[in-house]
Regions:
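C-terminal structured domains
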Residues: 1-82
Length: 82
């Protein structure tokens, strides 16, 4: 998973620390997009990106976090089937 917000490194680190709280999901955080990245979390869509993108224009709400968890489960289930 790559996390990158246009609001800067401090905000990106804040979101990354929140994501680290999902310990039971075994999330690997990356500082940049790579061929191994399967989820991109940001405030900007990258049109050419074919992986799951989670876009938050404002601080995430409880519903955003629920959808985040669902997206992780979906990606993990897809990778198990491959």
């Amino acid at each position: 998973m790559c996390v990158d917000f246009s609001l800067g490194e401090l905000y990106t680190n804040f979101i990354q620390n929140q994501i680290k709280g999902f310990k039971n999901l075994s999330i690997i955080l990356e500082n940049r997009l790579t061929s191994k990245t399967d989820i991109f979390v940001s405030d900007s869509v990258i049109e050419s990106l074919s992986i799951t993108q989670i876009i938050w224009k404002r601080p995430p709400t409880p519903l955003d976090w629920e959808m985040f968890g669902d997206a992780i489960v979906d990606v993990k289930n897809k990778s198990k089937r491959m």
